[in-house]
Swiss-Prot record:
Residue spans crossing the bilayer: 14-34, 80-100
Protein name per the record: Movement protein TGB2
Lumenal side: 35-79
Cytoplasmic compartment spans: 1-13, 101-119
Pfam families to which the protein is assigned, alphabetical: Plant_vir_prot
Organism for this UniProt entry: Potato mop-top virus (isolate Potato/Sweden/Sw) (PMTV)
Length: 119
């Protein structure tokens, strides 16, 4: 009986961890970019969520009428594309790292690394 010294490649056990990290990062990214800040302005009858004005006889209310950021749904100046570009670059860097650190061969190795395989 011939003994086989070849060691098979280990299965990739990291894909659930990578999938969980990607899901958490996506959730965090969407949470940061989709913040809605409902303001509590006005009185007990009139509420203005994103600014506006009301005039009634002796009462006049103006809230954020001249603020251009009041109507875009976000209180920050960071846009979706400004947040998406770093996420895209980090994802590309991670993909490149995983691509260039993979083994050079797909055959089973004899106890040594595939990079030193002379096939």
């Amino acid at each position: 009986m011939v003994r086989n010294n070849e060691i098979g490649a280990r299965p990739n056990k990291y894909w659930p961890v990578v999938a969980a990290v990607v899901a958490i990062c996506l959730f965090g990214f969407l949470t940061v970019t989709n913040q809605k800040h409902a303001t509590q302005s006005g009185d007990n009858i009139h509420k203005f969520a994103n600014g506006g004005q009301y005039r009634d006889g002796s009462k006049s209310i103006k809230y954020n009428c001249n603020n251009p950021r009041a109507y875009n749904g976000s209180s920050s100046n960071i846009t979706f594309s400004q947040l998406f570009l770093p996420v895209l670059l980090i994802g590309a860097a991670l993909y490149a790292y995983l691509w260039f650190t993979r083994p050079d061969c797909s055959v089973t190795c004899r106890g040594d690394c595939c990079r030193s395989y002379g096939g």
